Every structure is written in structure tokens, then in C-alpha cells.
UniProtKB/Swiss-Prot annotation:
Lineage: Bacteria, Pseudomonadati, Pseudomonadota, Gammaproteobacteria, Enterobacterales
Ranges of the Periplasmic topological domain: 26-54, 121-141
Organism per entry: Escherichia coli (strain K12)
Its biological purpose: Involved in cadaverine and putrescine tolerance in stationary phase. May facilitate the efflux of both cadaverine and putrescine from the cytoplasm, reducing potentially toxic levels under certain stress conditions.
Protein name as it appears in the record: Polyamine export protein
One family name in Pfam for this protein: CorC_HlyC
Gene Ontology cellular component annotations, sorted alphabetically: plasma membrane
Domain of life the protein comes from: Bacteria
């Protein structure tokens, strides 16, 4: 009996080794292993190589686990049944004692295997998968060498089955931006990343999805010089709007000639020279980009052209607005470079906000914790969302209810939504419900 118990313990140890090996190899993170391999850890590289082709490894593990389970059942019955039978035979019939001994012996062996050969080693492997994998890789390589004939045989059968059912035989481990975002989110929840670091990484990915109109200065807010503008008017504009660059156009903003740098104008003032644009002022070529460009592509355009300022045009060659390198960096860095600028979203209290109509829809989603706006590809700003939902040029008091919020137009500037009042009306998302002012509302407002 003692020999049988020792055999059972050895089988449990072997099964625990295979269980721990299986879960540790599957749970080991490639990024961490690659860092260790780059530092010269040979075992880390061996684990990576085995992860690339895990078929032989898992075949050996399954052969080992199944063989141990069968042997455990055979030896376990022989180890404990006689002892239980001799104990119970004193108090009951031999037939009943034999049946009860078998049940208890089976339960004891099964419980020992579940606890010590499966649950415990697998939990250890899940807690520290890389550390365990580095320690078991060499013994597993020896097992692979010893069991090579069996591995070839069973792997060949498995490959035939995979080909018959046209199943993929290699795992795809391409890392996507969603995978990185999930890791970052987990790091933020665990407290590893600070709030600013988390937001910065989120903003990096937004550069790929947000187009230039979401961060531009719209055309109605662009300060530009007419080629034939008088000198006093130019001085007044520079004094009132101290920008570093000014567009130069011919009669209207859609006929761009170039731009002038404020430093050039300052040098002419210091030299007592005229500021008139047709009197020798250097007019530089303007970088022009389409409105379909993403912010990351705009950064690349700035780098290629050696500029920090660009005009955005649509498909009809009409100026949509302008964007600067600072606009892109403000989107990327958020409050770190945006301090001192006029806030587009102002919280009145915990349940209401005043939002500028030109605020990018992504910023509104972040502040209000809204997952997605309907058909957001059709607009870039919260004002565009209102026009899209109302299906008309909005007027004051027009409103839309969405995602538990009421979006109400409170100010219009030349047909453009200048400000919205957003009020939380419900903690749960609600269906889209545009509301237009009717006769009854007008009567009540007059009263």
C-alpha cells in the first residue's frame, strides 16, 4: 500500500508539472518575454520559439496528462481500496464494503488530482506565467525530445483533421491599436498609469481617427489680409489679432496668394518701411491640405513641408479653415499645452454644461462619457451633430435628446450654432428625440 501511495504522489507531481507548463506557456506575455530575450535571457527566447509553434508542446502535455490520469486511476484503486475494505468489512457485508471502498478510493484520488495536480499548479502558472515558463522550458524540451515519435504520430493525425475541416493551423498574434488601448485601460484601472499619461496615450490614437476639421480654426474666424488692403487697416488687424501668420488673399478668402509672417512685418516697421502688401512685403507659399486628412497625416505634412501652418480646403477648392502645429499638439497634449485658451466646454454644475458649437465631437464624447454619436462620420463638431439630427438650420431653443442628455441651442451666430446648453436628464441612455419649438412653446414664451 505504501508503494502505491508513493506512486500516486509521483503521478500527482508529474501531472502538476504538465498542468503548470501548459497554463504558463499559454499565459506568458510575448512583450515581456521579448524584453527579457533582448536582455540576453536564452530561456525567454526558447519560450518565444515554443509559442510560435506550440503544436508539439501541447501534444506532449496532453499525452502526459492523459497517461498520468489513467495510471492514477489504476494505481489509486489498488492503493486505497484494500485499506477501506478492511475497515468497512467489520461493520457491513463484504459486497457493500467493496462498493463503498471503491467509491471512497475513487473520490480521494480524484480530489487529490484536482487539488494538487490541476487547480493549484494552474493558479501558480497564471499568477506568474513568465517566471514559471522560464523554469519549465528546459525540462519540457527534454520531454519533447523523448516523446518525439509519439508527437509526430499524433501531430500528423491532428494536422490531417485540421486540413479536412480547413481550420487554421497557426495562431495570429498581430497586435492592434485596440490591444494596446486595452492594455493602457487596464494599466489606468490598476493605478500604474496616471490620469495625464492615460489621456495622452488615448490622444495619440485619436490622431489617427480625427480629421483636420476637428481641430481647425473655421473660415469665419480666420483673420486674413486682402492683397490691396491699405496699410492702416493692416496695422489695425495686427494690433487686434496678434497672430504669428496671416493669410494673404485676393478679394476673398477662397483666392489665396500666400501668407505673411508677423516677424517680417515687425522688421519693416522697425525699418520705417511700408506694410502695404504690394510694396515689397515677402509673401510666402502656403501649405494647403484637404479636409479629409487625419491629424497624424497633417503632422507628417508639416514635417515634410517644414511648415507649422496650413490651409484646409474641401473638394470644391473652398477654404474650410486653417490648422497650425499648435492646434494638433493641443489635441495631443490636452491641458498641458491648452492652458490659457478659451474653454470650449464649461461645466455649470454636475448636470449641465455650456458647449461651443465648434467643439469636436470626440471631446464632447469624452466629457459626457458617451460611447458613440449616431452616424458620426457625417459631422465633426457638436454643432454639426445638431444640424444632422434636426435636418435644418437650427434656431434658438431647438433641442435634441440623446444618451440621457438634452442638447439645446442657446445662441446662434450668422446661422452657425455658437453655444449649446447640455443638461443631464436621465442616468440611462434615451432614444434620439429632436424637439423643435412649436406654436404652444412660442405662446408660453410670450406669456
Amino acid at each position: 500500500m505504501l508503494n502505491s501511495i508513493l506512486v500516486i504522489l509521483c503521478l500527482i507531481a508529474v501531472s502538476a508539472f504538465f498542468s503548470m507548463s501548459e497554463i504558463s506557456l499559454a499565459a506568458s506575455r510575448k512583450i515581456k518575454l521579448k524584453l527579457l530575450a533582448d536582455e540576453g535571457n536564452i530561456n525567454a527566447q526558447r519560450v518565444l520559439n515554443m509559442q510560435e509553434n506550440p503544436g508539439m508542446f501541447f501534444t506532449v502535455v496532453q499525452i502526459g496528462l492523459n497517461a498520468v490520469a489513467i495510471l492514477g486511476g489504476i494505481v489509486g484503486d489498488a492503493a486505497f481500496s484494500p485499506a477501506f475494505h478492511s475497515l468497512f468489512s467489520r461493520y457491513m457485508s463484504a459486497e457493500l464494503s467493496e462498493q463503498l471502498s471503491f467509491i471512497l478510493s475513487f473520490s480521494l484520488v480524484t480530489g487529490m488530482f484536482i487539488l494538487f495536480a490541476d487547480l493549484t499548479p494552474k493558479r501558480i502558472g497564471m499568477i506568474a506565467p513568465e517566471a514559471v515558463a522560464l523554469r519549465i522550458i528546459n525540462p519540457m524540451r527534454f520531454c519533447l525530445y523523448v516523446c518525439t515519435p509519439l508527437v509526430w504520430f499524433f501531430n500528423g493525425l491532428a494536422n490531417i483533421i485540421f486540413r479536412i475541416f480547413k481550420l487554421p493551423m497557426v495562431r495570429k498574434d498581430d497586435i492592434t491599436s485596440d490591444d494596446i488601448y486595452a492594455v493602457v485601460e487596464a494599466g489606468a484601472l490598476a493605478g500604474v498609469l496616471r490620469k495625464q499619461e492615460h489621456e495622452l496615450i488615448e490622444n495619440v490614437f485619436e490622431l489617427e481617427s480625427r480629421t483636420v476639421p476637428s481641430s481647425m480654426t473655421p473660415r469665419e474666424n480666420v483673420i486674413w489680409f486682402d492683397l490691396h488692403e491699405d496699410e492702416q487697416s493692416l496695422k489695425n488687424k495686427v494690433a487686434e489679432h496678434p497672430h504669428s501668420k496671416f493669410l494673404v488673399c485676393n478679394e476673398d478668402i477662397d483666392h489665396i496668394i500666400g501668407y505673411v509672417d508677423s516677424k517680417d512685418l515687425l522688421n519693416r516697421v522697425l525699418a520705417n518701411q511700408s506694410l502695404a502688401l504690394n510694396s515689397g512685403v515677402q509673401i510666402r507659399n502656403t501649405l494647403i491640405v484637404p479636409d479629409t486628412l487625419t491629424l497624424s497625416e497633417a503632422l507628417e505634412s508639416f514635417k515634410t513641408a517644414g511648415e507649422d501652418f496650413a490651409v484646409i480646403m474641401n473638394e470644391y477648392a473652398l477654404v474650410v479653415g486653417i490648422i497650425t502645429l499648435n492646434d494638433v499638439m493641443t489635441t495631443l497634449m490636452g491641458d498641458l499645452v491648452g492652458q490659457g485658451l478659451e474653454e470650449q466646454i464649461v461645466a455649470r454644475d454636475e448636470n449641465s454644461w455650456l458647449i461651443d458649437g465648434g467643439t469636436p465631437i470626440d471631446d464632447v464624447m469624452r466629457v459626457l462619457d458617451i460611447d458613440e454619436f449616431p452616424q458620426s462620420g457625417n459631422y465633426e463638431t457638436i454643432g454639426g451633430f445638431m444640424m444632422f439630427m434636426l435636418r435644418k438650420i437650427p434656431k434658438r431653443t431647438d433641442s435634441v435628446k440623446f444618451a440621457g442628455y438634452k442638447f439645446e441651442v442657446v445662441d446662434i451666430d450668422n446661422y452657425r450654432i455658437d453655444q449649446l446648453l447640455v443638461t443631464r436628464i436621465d442616468s440611462k441612455a434615451t432614444a434620439l428625440s429632436p424637439k423643435l419649438p412649436d406654436a404652444k412653446d412660442k405662446e408660453e414664451s410670450v406669456a
